[in-house]
Amino acid sequence: AWSQATKKHIKTSLTLYIRSMQKQLAPMGYHYRADDIEGKQHLEHVIPQNKIINAYLHGFITAEQALQMPLCIISDSDKHLLEGDWQQSGNWQYPFRRYQSAGYTKTIRSVDGRVIDMQKHTLDGHFAMLGIKA
């Protein structure tokens, strides 16, 4: 059996690798972008990265899905809105709903320019946009 330190090292390394690959694989380094970004930008994991890693490690999602999870550019000044508890408003099927419940009101568009309906946009729809089987 591996020590806790070894397990932690593996998970940290895996997280860094996945984060770097997610940015490389996303069409423009991201999949979604908020309108009216002022000042510094923040690349947001629509589903928190720790949730993605744990889901992958427990076999709930494939490696391809983990590497292609939605990334959204928002204003750095807005990121505090989304730092709330994923447990309360997190939703794998409808990942943007937590933006709504956090009070985020800016329009978000996909890389192909379509406005995202935060209430209805699904993770399956995200993967379909990328041509990935959900």
Model-predicted segments: where are they?
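A structural signal for short, well-ordered beta-strand segments and their strand-loop junctions
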Residues: 42, 72-76, 108
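Histidine-centered nuclease catalytic patch
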Residues: 35-67
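Generic local-structure boundary detector
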Residues: 52-59, 82-86, 110
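Short Cys/His-centered divalent metal-binding micro-motifs
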Residues: 65-92
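Nuclease and nuclease-like effector domains acting on nucleic acids or nucleotide cofactors
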Residues: 1-38, 84-134
